[in-house]
């Protein structure tokens, strides 16, 4: 071993999209994605879509 544990090389996935915002405002960012196998937290999800004008 060279001090590298494959299990620690987590693969992050995007979180879910945030809810749509009211009155045409952008929704908030989605929640962070789940962590990989002992890897870093996932990237934040995409912002929610715009609500109705």
From Swiss-Prot:
Modified residues (4-hydroxyproline): 26, 29, 32, 41, 44, 47
Top-level taxon: Eukaryota
Subcellular location: Secreted, Extracellular space, Extracellular matrix
The keyword Metal-binding appears for this protein: no
Residue numbers spanned by region Disordered: 1-53
Tissue expression notes: Forms the fibrils of tendon, ligaments and bones. In bones the fibrils are mineralized with calcium hydroxyapatite.
Biased composition (Low complexity): 10-23, 34-53
Keyword Iron in annotation: no
Keywords tagged on the record: Collagen, Extracellular matrix, Hydroxylation, Phosphoprotein, Repeat, Secreted
Modified residues (Allysine): 7
Primary location group: secreted
Post-translational modifications: Contains mostly 4-hydroxyproline. Proline residues at the third position of the tripeptide repeating unit (G-X-Y) are hydroxylated in some or all of the chains. Contains 3-hydroxyproline at a few sites. This modification occurs on the first proline residue in the sequence motif Gly-Pro-Hyp, where Hyp is 4-hydroxyproline.
GO terms for cellular component: collagen trimer; extracellular region
InterPro entries in the record: Collagen (IPR008160)
Function comment: Type I collagen is a member of group I collagen (fibrillar forming collagen).
Family recorded in the similarity comment: Belongs to the fibrillar collagen family.
Quaternary structure, from the entry: Trimers of one alpha 2(I) and two alpha 1(I) chains. Interacts with MRC2. Interacts with TRAM2. Interacts with MFAP4 in a Ca (2+)-dependent manner.
Protein name, per record: Collagen alpha-1(I) chain
């Amino acid at each position: 071993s060279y001090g590298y544990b494959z299990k620690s090389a987590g693969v992050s996935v995007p979180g879910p999209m945030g809810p749509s915002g009211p009155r045409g405002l952008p929704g908030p960012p989605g929640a962070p994605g789940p962590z990989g196998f002992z890897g870093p937290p996932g990237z934040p999800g995409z912002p929610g879509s715009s609500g109705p004008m």
